[in-house]
Amino acid sequence: MPKRTDIETILVIGSGPIVIGQAAEFDYAGTQACLSLKEEGYRVILINSNPATIMTDTEIADKVYIEPISLDFVSRILRKERPDAILPTLGGQTGLNMAIELDKSGILDELGIEILGTKLDAIHKAEDRDLFRNLMYELGAPVPESDIIHSLDEAKRFVVKIGYPVIVRPAFTLGGTGGGICYNDQDLEEIVTSGLKYSPVTQCLLEKSIAGYKEIEYEVMRDAVDNAIVVCNMENVDPVGIHTGDSIVVAPTQTLSDRENQMLRNISLDIIRALKIEGGCNVQLALDPYSFNYYVIEVNPRVSRSSALASKATGYPIAKLAAKIAVGLTLDEIKNPVTGSTYACFEPALDYIVAKIPRWPFDKFESAKRNLGTQMKATGEVMALGRTFEEAMLKAVRSLETGQVHLELKHAEDNSDSWIEKRIRKAGDERLFFIGEALRRGVTIEQIHEWSAIDLFFLNKFKNIVDMEQTLADHKNDKEVLRTAKRLGFADKKIAELWDTTEEAIYAYRKEQGIIPVYKMVDTCAAEFESETPYFYGTYEEENESIKSEKPSVVVLGSGPIRIGQGVEFDYATVHSVWAIQEAGYEAIIINSNPETVSTDFSISDKLYFEPLTIEDVMHIIDLEQPIGVVVQFGGQTAINLADKLAANGVKILGTSLEDIDRAENRDKFEQALRDLNIPQPQGETAVSTVEALAIGERLGFPVLVRPSYVLGGRAMEIVYNQEELQHYMENAVEASPDHPVLVDRYLTGQEIEVDAICDGEHVLIPGIMEHIERAGVHSGDSISVYPPQKLTQYQKDTLVDYTTRLAKGLGIVGLMNIQYVISQGEVYVIEVNPRSSRTVPFLSKITNIPMANIATKAILGKSIVEQGYPTGLAPEQKGVFVKVPVFSFAKLRRVDITLGPEMKSTGEVMGKDATLEKALYKGLVAAGMEIRTEGTVLFTVSDKDKEEAIALAKRFSTVGYRIVATEGTAKAFEAAGVRTDVVGKIGAKGQTLIDLIQNGEAQLVVNTLTKGKQPARDGFRIRRESVENGVPCLTSLDTAEAMVRVIESMTFTAEEMPKAEVVH
């Protein structure tokens, strides 16, 4: 069937902001799909609320709407654009749920709009737990004993029948939100209640737990004429019971016999055919390790996290082909873009092993529960390729950037044997490293298997790694042993430790002995056909397949796995930088380790190396490619941190020089630079010990802001209010960087301003100034930011432009820079300068139409801003108002305090744009998932220092018709100021307490400002967590609450009594 000609315009629904469970893989899928549809000649309209992605660039679709993905806004766009069809299966769970809502509302029938790709009834059959079960019975596919429940009583009846443990899976949710494994009645009550709350249809599936089975996934594709193929099969190293997004995964499957593989493969193909899915689909199965029994766990009828992994693991572009299938093309008509000669109906074959390890945010959230279950907690993932399981695994560990280069714990000796057993029995983010330690202590693989249910095959491979450590230690300087160790993926750093020498010495010795990696091509067909993909991984074998090109090349370092503080914004900048390098006539080479992103799509760069971002792995590539230089400013802190080691190896750093990067990042040098330039900054000093820090605190006066130098996303940054808190901080957090001192600053309250600029060495271009709604002290990534600024005077704007221009030139910036200012009592102070691309670059580039990463890259390559045809100074302000609103994933992380502070906590962002600030804020808040009601109840619990401000807010809430509720102290203050307030009991009081109020859904909004101290057991913490678990918006900054009330005021009509005439005597 050739492609359809009866449709012209297609609306693609994006996946919205990045949250845990739905990350950059959908930006990748959506970008691929839009380009793929345009390639076939369709007119593509995109709606997505996320400004940080490549997908929402105007080149990707014919029309791009950055608007909330809500029934209201999507319907408006449908009415305005009248597309012929919509394609929802590439926008993750957001896209699917939106399609179902649109269908229910009747607008699709009314406008005659068709749904492309997988049909709605197939989506229902896969997502609705009841329909899915019935379909499996018809196919004769076994599913675990289960029951659909709508209330806690039904759940209890089911458990009486089959006993514990049971798994709870809420319907139509993402990343297992609200689900979990129950071992007893208490778990059941907690998890079922939360599951019913998070399911949009209040429905959960309870099933008999088959934890301990092998978890196998098949990524399959089918077209409209029933051709179906398996693109990739994958095996979770962790057994069933851990969400696949939190599992370590290998491809292809390692421990299945041919019979098992064929059996599971056939059922996967039967399922996709029975569901009549057109496009990609992911089938998860559980296999009993001791027999041929298996169960079908679930089916995702859409492009998913696993399909992004499968695409990168095999080189087979699933999303691109799914889009073509959606418009009627068939697998035997579509050329495989990798080989350029075979068709898409050939199943990929792998002659290497792929390992994926999730990246968790626990380094940012110390108080979070670290155990893993059916609810996903990872923010991102890394992938590595190798010729042996050991090599792929160790390369993946190095890619995580958690400071580990090997299968070992930090401070392993502090762990008792019983603690190690406990951490292996209960899955957690460090289980892999605990297994390594257990093997070193002589625990047998059979014993570890009994504790963890991880297959002996994998444990044996981990044992090979541990045995090799001993062999290396026994054979110092033996080059054959060295060669074997490198084949198992050992890092030079680890070998150096075992041989009592330095990493550099090992690297030099290997080069001299000719023990260097070769680069193999990822070609989808195990080298059966000629292939033209420039996609490589390194391994220690004979033949090198990566040929250095004739053209001069530039290497761009990517930003590694997505984590809090370093999100998809940096990938955006990386991709734009690559395009600019190509436009300037050079060959662009990318090194990155993240399978979810656009930058690791082989069609983006001239060459893609899928390797860890460590000095060893990067130097190998540079030795081979001999580029004219390396660009480090787009890869976030990951790339900046490699700069000094690269320069020490004689590599040219393009753009801002290493000395100048250091002048911006090193505190003492930075302060000196500001003094030379005569630019004011908050008073501050540097401490290298606790004693010194306490003395500085005394001198400056509290509160002070403390942080280590050289960190991203405000890691280990805190505002402390007294000596005890400062001492606690110095003793617990400063390990964040032992070689670097700690900065102690006077904490200025005031408005925070952020400026991005581009400098070519002599000219400075400032695309825009952004104003934060939350006052200084909230991390810039967690603040709502507004463009153009609404409150600045002309004098302040001029001062900001002047300081920014002087800083850019004075610090020798070439390329991008980001500066944060605070305006305290009318004066402008500099807080910090980042000599690199920042997380506001995509947002600013889109709203000002100044392609910042592109201009900066060309400036780095020697073409001035003026030569590129851009003006200097502050660009003229755009019409309208644009806001960037942070999005958090607190519902996924139990026990994390949601208070905003100097340490970043948001995982993603959305944009709202409109004619006025209030309208833009409304869209931003709605897109970020807040429900804004024009009436309801607002609960205030504020600290004494905030009472004054809170009274003014309470008055405004009351005027628009909200009921005000507060605890006794606050209520008294409100009443005294003339605000009608209902009193509610504190936690633990008799009668109705505020926790009851939140749990019963009586509050639509909670305003809770910090009570001092970071102790989680505090009442404030309980209130904030209860709000999150009950889906009530909780604002921890009065500035955000003020923004919210402005929006509500702008939506409501007033009802004021007539003024009385004054009596005249």
Curated annotation (Swiss-Prot):
PROSITE patterns recorded: ATP_GRASP, CPSASE_1, CPSASE_2, MGS
Keyword vocabulary terms for this entry: Amino-acid biosynthesis, Arginine biosynthesis, ATP-binding, Ligase, Magnesium, Manganese, Metal-binding, Nucleotide-binding, Pyrimidine biosynthesis, Repeat
Binding site for ATP 2: 707, 746, 748, 752, 777-780, 820, 832
Amino-acid positions noted as binding Mn(2+) 2 in the UniProt annotation, renumbered to this chain: 298, 300
GO cellular component, one term: cytoplasm
Pfam families in the cross-refs: CPSase_L_D2, CPSase_L_D3, MGS
Binding sites annotated in the UniProt record for Mg(2+) 2: 298, 300
The protein, known as: Carbamoyl phosphate synthase large chain
Lineage: Bacteria, Bacillati, Bacillota, Bacilli, Bacillales
Gene giving rise to this polypeptide: carB
